[in-house]
Amino acid sequence: MFKIFRTKWFRSAPVLATLWLSSTAVILIGVNSYFPDYLFMPMS
């Protein structure tokens, strides 16, 4: 079922970079929805 995770295609650099950037963007958007100005003014 999870054979795609063991293939050479999935471990290539562009795929890993896309997954990393996408997950980082999702985390930042999620945090920004709960704390709207926290990313710009963290000390306020």
From Swiss-Prot:
Query: Which example biological process does GO assign this protein?
Result: photosynthesis
This chain belongs to the protein called: Photosystem I reaction center subunit IX 2
GO cellular component labels: photosystem I; plasma membrane-derived thylakoid membrane
Membrane topology annotation = Single-pass membrane protein
Q: Where in the cell is it found?
A: Cellular thylakoid membrane
InterPro entries cross-referenced by the UniProt entry:
PSI_PsaJ (IPR002615), PSI_PsaJ_sf (IPR036062)
Q: Which gene encodes it?
A: psaJ2
Bilayer-crossing regions: 13-35
User: Which Pfam families does the record associate with it?
Assistant: PSI_PsaJ (PF01701)
Q: What does this protein do?
A: May help in the organization of the PsaE and PsaF subunits.
Q: Which UniProt keywords apply?
A: Membrane, Photosynthesis, Photosystem I, Thylakoid, Transmembrane, Transmembrane helix
State the family it belongs to.
Belongs to the PsaJ family.
